[in-house]
């Protein structure tokens, strides 16, 4: 929204607020008064937000007007800046100056030359003139990436290689090591080189670039950006919504929550230069701060026989997203030249609790069995199960169990248990039946507890609605009656299961020794 629409909306909200205040003074019903007070609070909050948006728009227009007053100076500023630095850094030294230094000190103070005083004055004036000037300075991160940040000159110093340089403080720090130390400029920092904040960085004059004002016109919903948080650092984020000069951003880090920031707390990404820059004459291809772009026909992508990221149906799918963030194009090979492997690495699930030697033996056995193509022979029957096998040894307890269960002492009848079934197998069968009874009994008890909780909730609701709504009370009474019937059925089912369980225990005690 522009300034005029915000002013119109502000006048409308003021008129509505006056009408609401008049209605409050008219003496209405208590129910209507509560709604009017709520509406009054909402209108006041809306007026405050609209006024804040109007102030933000006016501030941005004022800053744009101040920046547009000197376009000619900005074009000539980089050359003048470099010339001034070179002039202040390259001070002419006479051939015999070094040799004459010691005798002059020994003989005491002598008359100072006017040219020397002028040179010292020019050095001080040049350093003072450069201090506070904004530039675009390089920064090498800990992992070797070159980035250009907007910075401010705080003084002139000689670079490590002896060339003229300046000490700069970065204006938009993205790391804690770039954040300016609050005590450095005042000379009160006690940690000096061990300080975890930045005391400035010495940069060669040849590496400096002109200062670039952040261009917010290209930012829209879905654009990548840098957003400032309360700790003073700028984090990579993505814009999700733009409304009246306010930007809703979602940070790339999952540890940071979504935030709403103004225009002075948001920047375009640092690694993107404007498309129409005057010095982009093909030298960007050799710039180490930019990734090498592979032409569509330059790489020969291999054929992939399996679906890319097909394994992620079993995972959360973070692998393919990380590859896409690092610039990988689906169907091409890995590596900066897209000449790496195309086939994904297939996962092999090994048996749990086995060593690598045992896993290798298992794989070898499977390979041999597959190559031989011979099916495994069926397992032999247990001894005594065939017609010619010896019968298992029988004890007096087996004889008593057969007699008490009604079995014949001789050969088994048709439809009876298969031959060779011992008393231990019969005991295992009864144990599984008992386990099933216990499971059903446990499930029934859980249902009884749930029904009792539901009955208590319905009774509390009836107590709350007593004498208020007859329809609601009737419905709750019907629900209560249904829940009580269900509780009676569940209790009857529980009693039946308990009887069966006691019967099984009694049968086991009486029939097995």
From Swiss-Prot:
Its main location: nucleus. It is found in: Nucleus. Residues 315-361 form the G-patch domain. The modification N-acetylmethionine is found at residue 1. The keyword Transcription applies. GO terms for molecular function: DNA-binding transcription factor activity; DNA-binding transcription repressor activity, RNA polymerase II-specific; RNA polymerase II cis-regulatory region sequence-specific DNA binding; sequence-specific DNA binding; zinc ion binding. Residues 497-513 have a biased composition (Basic and acidic residues). It comes from the Eukaryota. The modification Phosphoserine is found at residues 278, 355. GO terms for biological process: negative regulation of DNA-templated transcription; negative regulation of epidermal growth factor-activated receptor activity. A zinc finger (C3H1-type) spans 176-202. One of its GO terms (cellular component) is plasma membrane. Pfam families: G-patch (PF01585), zf-CCCH_4 (PF18044). Residues 115-126 have a biased composition (Acidic residues). Keywords: Acetylation, DNA-binding, Metal-binding, Nucleus, Phosphoprotein, Repressor, Transcription, Transcription regulation, Zinc, Zinc-finger. PROSITE patterns: G_PATCH, ZF_C3H1. Disulfide bonds: none annotated. Interacts with CHD4/Mi-2; the interaction is direct. This is Zinc finger CCCH-type with G patch domain-containing protein. It comes from Ovis aries (Sheep). The gene is ZGPAT.
């Amino acid at each position: 929204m522009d300034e005029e629409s915000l002013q119109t909306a502000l006048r409308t909200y003021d008129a509505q607020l006056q009408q609401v205040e008049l209605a409050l003074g008219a003496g209405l019903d208590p129910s209507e008064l509560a709604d009017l007070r709520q509406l009054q609070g909402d209108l006041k909050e809306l007026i405050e937000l609209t006024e804040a948006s109007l102030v933000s728009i006016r501030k941005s227009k004022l800053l744009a007007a101040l920046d547009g007053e000197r376009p000619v100076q900005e074009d000539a500023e980089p050359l003048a800046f470099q010339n001034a630095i070179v002039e202040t850094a390259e001070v002419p030294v006479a051939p015999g100056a070094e040799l004459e230094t010691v005798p002059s000190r020994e003989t005491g103070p002598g008359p100072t030359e006017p040219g020397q005083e002028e040179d010292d004055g020019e050095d001080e004036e040049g350093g003072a003139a450069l201090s506070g000037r904004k530039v675009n300075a390089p920064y090498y991160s800990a992992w070797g990436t070159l980035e250009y940040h907007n910075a401010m000159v705080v003084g002139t110093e000689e670079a490590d290689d002896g060339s003229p340089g300046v000490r700069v403080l970065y204006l938009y720090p993205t790391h804690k090591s770039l954040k300016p130390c609050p005590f450095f400029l005042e000379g009160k920092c006690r940690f000096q080189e061990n300080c975890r904040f930045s005391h400035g960085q010495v940069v060669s004059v040849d590496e400096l670039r002109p200062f670039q004002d952040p261009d917010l016109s290209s930012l829209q919903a879905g654009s990548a950006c840098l957003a400032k948080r309360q700790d003073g650092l700028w984090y990579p984020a993505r814009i999700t919504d733009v409304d009246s000069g306010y930007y809703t951003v979602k940070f790339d880090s999952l540890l940071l929550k979504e935030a709403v920031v103004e225009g002075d707390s948001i920047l375009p990404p640092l690694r993107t230069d404007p498309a129409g820059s005057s010095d982009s004459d093909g030298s960007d291809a050799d710039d180490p701060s930019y990734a090498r772009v592979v032409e569509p026909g330059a790489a020969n992508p291999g054929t992939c026989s399996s679906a890319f990221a097909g394994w992620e149906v079993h995972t959360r799918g973070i692998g393919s997203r990380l590859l896409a963030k690092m610039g990988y194009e689906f169907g091409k090979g890995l590596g900066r030249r897209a000449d790496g492997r195309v086939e994904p690495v297939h996962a092999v699930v090994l048996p749990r609790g086995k060593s690598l030697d045992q896993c290798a033996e298992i794989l070898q056995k499977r390979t041999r069995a597959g190559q031989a193509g011979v099916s495994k022979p069926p397992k032999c029957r247990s001894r005594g199960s065939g017609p010619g096998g010896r019968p298992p040894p029988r004890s007096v307890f087996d004889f008593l169990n057969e007699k008490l269960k009604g079995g014949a002492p001789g050969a088994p009848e048709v439809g009876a248990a298969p031959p060779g079934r011992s008393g231990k197998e019969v005991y295992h069968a009864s144990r599984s039946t008992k386990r099933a009874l216990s499971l059903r009994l446990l499930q029934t008890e859980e249902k009884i507890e749930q029904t009792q909780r539901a009955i208590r909730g319905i009774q509390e609701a009836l107590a709350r609605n007593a004498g208020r709504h007859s329809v609601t009370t009737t419905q709750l009474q019907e629900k209560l009656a249904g829940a009580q019937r269900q509780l009676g059925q569940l209790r009857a089912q529980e009693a039946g299961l308990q009887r069966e369980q006691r019967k099984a225990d009694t049968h086991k005690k009486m029939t097995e020794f």
